[in-house]
Amino acid sequence: MITRRNALTLAGIGLVAGGGFTLLRDTEMGAAAGLPDLGAANAQDAGAIEDITLGDPNAPVKVVEYASYTCPHCATFHNNTFKEFQKEYIDSGKVHFTYREVFFDRYGLWAAMVARCAGADRYFGVADLLYQTQGQWARQGDAASVAESLKRVGAQAGLTPDALDACLQDADMAQNLVAWYEANAEEDNVRSTPSFLINGEMHSGSMSLSQIGALVDDAAS
């Protein structure tokens, strides 16, 4: 489980290095792989970011997952539990599901940008690829290598090289995503990932199908 203590902010960015987190200036982060400058001078509009959702908006139970693409426990949930959860609870009309990205480091931000640039219809397909290959791209230790790996994931989803370059150079989207994350985390008191807001009640930690299913069933009763 990753905690919000090391969260990425607009003033600086957490980078996993040497077993700990260090802070880099936003200009250093962008220069590392030719990716967007997150300078505070750029406009920040949390309202410009739309939620990614699945299922019937009128379902009796609302589940909001907060997760980071670089969080190992989030990968465990998505690789081991999510597909069955979707089949049993979302596709059946019991749950309206919202996925909200959390940014503890620049790599998680870049991954979210690639997934969102694929579009709403392909978002969860890209998310699957990102979580399935997390160990291959998220811990390479070299920003340029991570960026190239993320581009390969995007290419598997059908994004062209030009589209991927434009996506990862979109400083406005990067700024807006971080502002959106911070607003959501503050409103819902998100402290770690994965966290699940189930009909307004927060639960933390990766869960099995039986565990999250029991919480959903309780919320529906």
Residue ranges and their predicted role:
Residues I2-D105, V178, S221:
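Extracytoplasmic thiol/disulfide redox context detector
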Residues I2-L24, G30, G34, S68, ...:
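C-terminal cap of thioredoxin/glutaredoxin-like
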Residues A41, G55-P57, P72, N80, ...:
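Surface-exposed loop/turn and secondary-structure junction residues enriched for glycine/proline
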Residues G47-I49, Q132, I198:
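Residue-level signal for pocket-adjacent positions within structured domains
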Residues A48-E50, W110, L164:
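Glycine-rich, flexible loop/turn motifs
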Residues A67-T70, A75-A155:
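Structural alpha/beta surface segment adjacent to cysteine/selenocysteine redox centers
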